[in-house]
Amino acid sequence: MDEDIQQEVQNLRDLIHKHEGTTARYLTERRRALNRLNKLGLPWPMIGREIGITTQTAMRWAGKWSRLRR
């Protein structure tokens, strides 16, 4: 894995672990970090595996998969 990608993965792990700041800011930072990783070329299943969540959860957190609201 590329050094840039490893650094981004570590930053995302730290962000999720700390969960500091307001909820809205945390969600925005988490979404941006996930999308940055995907833009660097890491596929969604691998992103999920690296941070310990499912592919669907990673995509939902990144805003790529919205839940149905009824």
Enumerate the language-model features and the residues they cover.
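N-terminal acidic leader/helix
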Residues: 1-22
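Short coil/turn linker and secondary-structure boundary residues
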Residues: 3-7, 42, 53
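Short, amphipathic alpha-helical "recognition" segments used to contact nucleic acids or chromatin
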Residues: 25-42
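DNA major-groove recognition helix of helix-turn-helix
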Residues: 30, 38, 51, 62-66
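Short, solvent-exposed alpha-helical "recognition" segments
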Residues: 44, 59-70
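Short alpha-helical "recognition helix" segments of helix-turn-helix
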Residues: 47-49
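Key DNA-contact positions within bacterial/archaeal DNA-binding proteins
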Residues: 56
